[in-house]
Amino acid sequence: MATVAEQWVLVEMVQALYEAPAYHLILEGILILWIIRLLFSKTYKLQERSDLTLKEKEELIEEWQPEPLVPPVSKDHPALNYNIVSGPPSHNIVVNGKECINFASFNFLGLLDNPRLKAAALASLKKYGVGTCGPRGFYGTFDVHLDLEDRLAKFMKTEEAIIYSYGFATIASAIPAYSKRGDIVFVDKAACFAIQKGLQASRSDIKVFNHNDMDDLERLLKEQEIEDQKNPRKARVTRRFIIVEGLYMNTGTVCPLPELVKLKYKYKARIFLEESLSFGVLGEHGRGVTEHFGISIDDIDLISANMENSLASIGGFCCGRSFVIDHQRLSGQGYCFSASLPPLLAAAAIEALNIMEENPGIFAVLKEKCKRIHKALQGIPGLKVVGESISPALHLQLEETTGCRERDVKLLQEIVTQCMDRGIALTQARYLEKEEKYLPPPSIRVVVTVEQTEEDLEKAASTISEVAQTVLL
């Protein structure tokens, strides 16, 4: 039966071939030949080429003009006119061979040149050596690292802490460890560059609210709430984060934490608090903006800070609940893929914590000096003070811009240079202008430390005022 059926099909095919129109057969034949040609032909043609003559080669070489390896840079660019520091940048700093009072370094508690920190670091150096030569997960965890994490957790009154070997990488690693693609982040417009890099790495949906404007933040939260109601299934798996600084690097202002906590619970969001400037500065015991406002540490989901300011060491830390911190040990890129903090720096940070706990009055002294310099800098012709009176890092901006950022920078740099000639070391706030999301105006940064005397503060204010009148008027 099968053979008969096959013969019948063959007969039908031959009959259909005879009955088909001629143009149909021609078209099918052309297509079959084209397919055969494609199967057996090469995917490319060898182009016929003729070698250039010696004369033609010489002409091409003569005409060729190489592009510059780097873009042209003016001779007065800051990168080509750097200052050379000799010795530790403590209360007095030697810049380009000239001794000045240091109003530029974030040595808020004056611990950078402290003998106790030096002794602790030296003892650790003799015991452990210089570095660890490995990340925390690969034989880079020393007992001093665990001691420091335990001390930080107890000092901040949290369940657990984790340390990073580089301050900038701390918040830049913590953000993408939790916030992923599809999550929503509400961030302050004045957020520092480290937060910006963390947001970029997270690939989350970023919503920016005006600086310290809680009405604008609530507007964005309400808009998101309306969007969530349209798609409840998606809303259930979408996480919402509010990321702010305790004391803003770019403005010297304190975040309104009580209002932020209210919005957190009202709209079911998580708060990440970056406290690199406020840790060791604000609060009765230097615990930061939570202690400053009397807010429970449990109301904040994650706190991050570097140890390069008040603790006069290197690296950074995050603290919070244990399940939050443990997640970073496998997901924090700066923790997993960087060599761990050198033990000598961890030992120095522990000793700095000891000093902070032994002498809590140091924070009141710093606060009082911040208020004095803030008041003394008011009313300088041509300059305005940006920042709160309790901030140890203030900004001096031009009252009226020239309309050109480059000219503004040059004017402020001239003030910095002349102040340095008179024994006051200042610095401009520097930014990667092409990478900043919202570029702050040019400014001179004035940093207050506990080591500065009343005479130092008065001298700095009077020097800045005199130089500003000379340069700007």
From Swiss-Prot:
Any one biological process term the GO annotation gives: sphingosine biosynthetic process
Post-translational modifications: Phosphorylation at Tyr-164 inhibits activity and promotes cell survival.
Name the membrane topology term. Answer: Single-pass membrane protein
Enzyme class, UniProt record, top EC level: transferase
Compartments where located: Endoplasmic reticulum membrane
Q: Which cofactor does it need?
A: pyridoxal 5'-phosphate
Q: Which SUPFAM superfamilies match?
A: PLP-dependent transferases (SSF53383)
To which protein family does this belong?
Belongs to the class-II pyridoxal-phosphate-dependent aminotransferase family.
Role, per record: Component of the serine palmitoyltransferase multisubunit enzyme (SPT) that catalyzes the initial and rate-limiting step in sphingolipid biosynthesis by condensing L-serine and activated acyl-CoA (most commonly palmitoyl-CoA) to form long-chain bases. The SPT complex is also composed of SPTLC2 or SPTLC3 and SPTSSA or SPTSSB. Within this complex, the heterodimer with SPTLC2 or SPTLC3 forms the catalytic core. The composition of the serine palmitoyltransferase (SPT) complex determines the substrate preference.
Q: What is this protein called?
A: Serine palmitoyltransferase 1
**What organism is this sequence from?**
Bos taurus (Bovine)
Which gene is this protein's source?
Answer: SPTLC1
